[in-house]
């Protein structure tokens, strides 16, 4: 079976709930882009969408969110570019090696104010471990054979991750609440 993700394939290492953050680095051999995260990630998950950066040979990325105020480019920011300026999540990647360092939402969106990051780009240990798998069926759109999907979902379950074809129920509830508040169906403050 192909690799789901290096941090998932052989079991998941638990993170440290008191972890204070660290630095992410692109894969360039020199003049690496450095991004400092002043805190741990939340909602860390395996993502099968076609937009997220994935390690070579992996079917899924592992991505979490952190307040955009806790994210700062601390070295070689001149090497960053936005992969797709029309996307809701503006993924900032290294122009040279292609690694995505952070994704920022600048349009009106339920997750505006949160940046999407790949904690695996950090040498520090203690980041929140993956909590679930999202957009699992999306790997079919990238050429994965549909007949093998049950095995993928079972592999996630074996390591303790619930596979979803959207986001987790908690995140879907947040999106629905945001939408209801914007439309006036729910009060702005609950």
UniProtKB/Swiss-Prot annotation:
Lineage: Eukaryota, Fungi, Dikarya, Ascomycota, Pezizomycotina
InterPro entries registered for this protein in UniProt: CENP-V/GFA, Formald_GSH, Mss4-like_sf
Record keywords: Lyase, Metal-binding, Zinc
Keyword match Protein biosynthesis: no
HAMAP family per UniProt: Formald_GSH
The protein's name: Putative glutathione-dependent formaldehyde-activating enzyme
Domain CENP-V/GFA span(s) in chain numbering: 19-165
Chemical reaction(s) catalysed: S-(hydroxymethyl)glutathione = glutathione + formaldehyde
Family classification: Belongs to the Gfa family.
Positions with a binding annotation for Zn(2+) 1: 26, 28, 94, 97
Taxonomic source organism: Pyrenophora teres f. teres (strain 0-1) (Barley net blotch fungus)
E.C. number(s) listed in UniProt: 4.4.1.22
